[in-house]
Amino acid sequence: MLRHDGRSNTQLRSVRILRNYIKHAEGSVLIEVGDTKVICTASVEERIPPFKKDSGEGWVTAEYSMLPRATAVRNQRDISKLKLNGRSSEIQRLIGRSLRTIVDLKLLGERTITIDCDVIQADGGTRTASITGSYVALVDACRTLVKKGLISKMPVTGTVAATSVGIVNGEELLDLCYIEDSNAEVDMNVIKTDKGEFIEIQATGEKSSFSKKQLDQLLNLAESGIHELIKAQNEVLWKD
């Protein structure tokens, strides 16, 4: 099928990761996946949540938000509603647990790294772009800790990236933009490590059910996209 932006069914949108985007953060990136743009920062704080007290371990957590005009129609800020909306809450928990999967919390020591993901322009795949960009910010924050002598070795034990796949007009597509996502019969987000292991699969039959064969095809498609994303992460992390 001819996609909205001219891509093939198996093609990612263009990916750009710009490191050190925010001056004061220990790690930061601007990630662009097509027209979706997210600023991801990693901030180190010498404290841990109460449930980690005396554990000898650190913590990695995340917050997610979207600028009011990141979308075609202005959205209210969560603060104006005096509560975090359910979608933002779900996404930030997803980001946090995805990153904790590849961090040795004992090596991190009793400190917290907070990941802030701020969507400045949304065109589908904001949660997957947030995870992919946050990984790079997290690595840079941990490198800062090593350089300062606050930890002896890198606590990051692997790589994590995420992408979306779906079925639109009966065809399996990689990396859905907003128009495709809003018209998908099946929508799926996939998070994997560089070892090929799954962290999370979120699959929903939005307008129809799907078969085991289709599930396998979507997972294979996601795997190919994540392989490309991990390559892009490594290229920016090791170019200097």
Curated annotation (Swiss-Prot):
In this chain, phosphate is annotated as bound at R87, G125, T126, R127
Has keyword DNA-binding?
no
GO function term, MF aspect, one: 3'-5'-RNA exonuclease activity
GO-annotated biological processes: rRNA catabolic process; rRNA processing; tRNA processing
E.C. number, please? 2.7.7.56
Query: Which Pfam families does the UniProt entry name for this protein?
Result: RNase_PH (PF01138), RNase_PH_C (PF03725)
Quote the CDD domains the UniProt record gives. RNase_PH_bact
The kind of enzyme this is, by top-level EC class, is transferase
Q: Key word tRNA-binding present in the record?
A: yes
Q: Which UniProt keywords apply?
A: Nucleotidyltransferase, RNA-binding, rRNA processing, Transferase, tRNA processing, tRNA-binding
Q: Which reaction does it catalyse?
A: tRNA(n+1) + phosphate = tRNA(n) + a ribonucleoside 5'-diphosphate
Q: What does this protein do?
A: Phosphorolytic 3'-5' exoribonuclease that plays an important role in tRNA 3'-end maturation. Removes nucleotide residues following the 3'-CCA terminus of tRNAs; can also add nucleotides to the ends of RNA molecules by using nucleoside diphosphates as substrates, but this may not be physiologically important. Probably plays a role in initiation of 16S rRNA degradation (leading to ribosome degradation) during starvation.
The UniProt similarity line reads: Belongs to the RNase PH family.
How does this polypeptide assemble, per the annotation? Homohexameric ring arranged as a trimer of dimers.
HAMAP family reported in the protein's UniProt record: RNase_PH (MF_00564)
Q: What is this protein called?
A: Ribonuclease PH
Q: What does UniProt list as this organism's lineage? A: Bacteria, Bacillati, Bacillota, Clostridia, Eubacteriales
Write the gene name: rph
